[in-house]
Amino acid sequence: MLTDIEISRQATPQPISDIAKKFGIKKDELSQFGDAKAKVKISILDRVKDNVEGKLVIVTAVTPTPFGEGKTVTSIGLTQGLNAIGRKTCACIRQPSMGPVFGIKGGAAGGGYSQVIPMEEMNLHLTGDIHAVSSAHNLAAAAVDARLFHESRLSADEYTLQSGSAPLNIDPEQILWRRVVDHNERSLRNITVGLGDINGPVHASGFDITAASELMAILALSHDLKDMRKRIGRLVLALDKHAQPITAEMIGVAGAMTVIMSNAIEPTLMQTLTGDPCLIHAGPFANIAHGNSSIIADRIALKFADFVVTEGGFGSDMGFEKFCNIKVRESGKAPDAAVLVVTLKALKANSGLESKQDINLPDQARLEAGFLNLKWHMDNVSQYGVPVVVALNRFPSDTQEELEWLKREVMLAGAFGCEISDAFSLGANGAEALAHKVVEATEQDSDFRLLYSSDASIEAKLLTIAESGYGARGVVLSDEAKAQLEQIKAMGLDNLAVCIAKTPLSISHDPLLKGVPQGFELPIAQLKINAGAGFITALVGKVMTMPGLGVKPGYLNIDINEQDEIVGLA
């Protein structure tokens, strides 16, 4: 079979204005970036405000494995399949970060015959939104350090005279705003800035990957430009010497940050291999951020489509949980159905059983042990009151006997439906059965419910997610986290949602605990204030907000060939 990039390159994309027209978007509501992609102006929402909204379907998965479960393939394939059976459908997915593209995971455009094209344009830069987030974020870091520098060299009266504003008395030991870059760079996790006689007070800092920036979360959770401006103003950048918050508004940088991101608030329209519309917007990771595409993209798509297919990153304990407890809490739009993606390989890998046998070969013992992980994720999704359709993403090595066994077990375990998906190899034709079942699921009465109330304390929210969301028997806060919790309460921010940052490789905090871990306590290392985004991030265990490159990174395969074409993107 051809590689993803070869399949993408063989296709001839339709003019993006034609894709928009079929979907109901007018030409003057687009800002085109060449023939294959365009920004959709947010003002379009005024024109379609009275349109009836379509159905929202969220795609999630079992605990991820190195083999890939095919969540984005399934999201794009389902979009193709729904359109093929006459249901007007749009996909809404995140913009890929270049960190994973050049690292180990690769791109995020789908794959095979269910992908967004041109895939190299999607995976590299797109329309520049991530760069805008990086620039706005780093402007705030520069503004804080500039303020600190000038306040440290001038008396309070002289500073007020020269600047026209009173000193903020920033505590250099309490600068909370780090820097970001859209690459995996472990050496920048912890740095010291201000070295040298004329470069300002020395203090600790560091870099996170741009996908972990609070600005990325703000981009994904804002309703419009005015809302984004308010949220950016609420960013807590540092504390003063009395432990009071210093915001982007107080520094005076919020307006400029918003201007840098003013075009980024518009989602980018692209297409699948079969000409189906796809809105790509925002790119927060699901392990270290909230892991979902934007509310704005969903709002636009829902006003034009019968069905909107979106996805949450990693397993249902990660992106799906945050979709429900963070994104839905902000948007007010609950999902009508959930699709849970699984593969035979994933079940065997999640079995927790040691085996020297090739994972592609039949192995009933590992399959049965790994099924417990799938059952856990089914129950996890069901507790939110959403009908669950399991999608068995078929690999060429899968046996019909194992697939049929798994279908039977899934239905006995209480799923609304279970269908084999051949979207990767067949595109729309391989996802029509799944599409029909999803339509049936959305016709059921939905009883969506959040996991916790906004009025609950931070401790109660953490405990609820740990126990109900991960199966833990409790939480343990480090001394640092306890002190930060008191700070959060003193600032009156304990009404915010909670975003857990943890490993995606286990339902627990320990990536080595496979299957369905039990009896563990969730260790909370730090609590970070994200007042602009509207949540508190709890860093669990040894999770890192800046990834590192592995011994065999993806960039080794990427180059330009003799025809000046990009090769090696996965």
Swiss-Prot record:
Pathway(s) annotated for this protein in UniProt: One-carbon metabolism; tetrahydrofolate interconversion
Record's catalysed reaction(s): (6S)-5,6,7,8-tetrahydrofolate + formate + ATP = (6R)-10-formyltetrahydrofolate + ADP + phosphate
Domain of life, per lineage: Bacteria
A GO molecular-function descriptor: ATP binding
PROSITE patterns noted in UniProt: FTHFS_1
Residues binding ATP: 65-72
EC supergroup of this enzyme: ligase
Keywords assigned: ATP-binding, Ligase, Nucleotide-binding, One-carbon metabolism
Enzyme Commission number(s): 6.3.4.3
Alphabetical GO biological process terms: tetrahydrofolate interconversion
SUPFAM superfamilies: P-loop containing nucleoside triphosphate hydrolases
InterPro entries: Formate_THF_ligase, Formate_THF_ligase_CS, P-loop_NTPase
Pfam families: FTHFS
Transferase among keywords: no
Family, similarity comment: Belongs to the formate--tetrahydrofolate ligase family.
NCBIfam families: PRK13505.1, PRK13506.1
Record-given protein name: Formate--tetrahydrofolate ligase
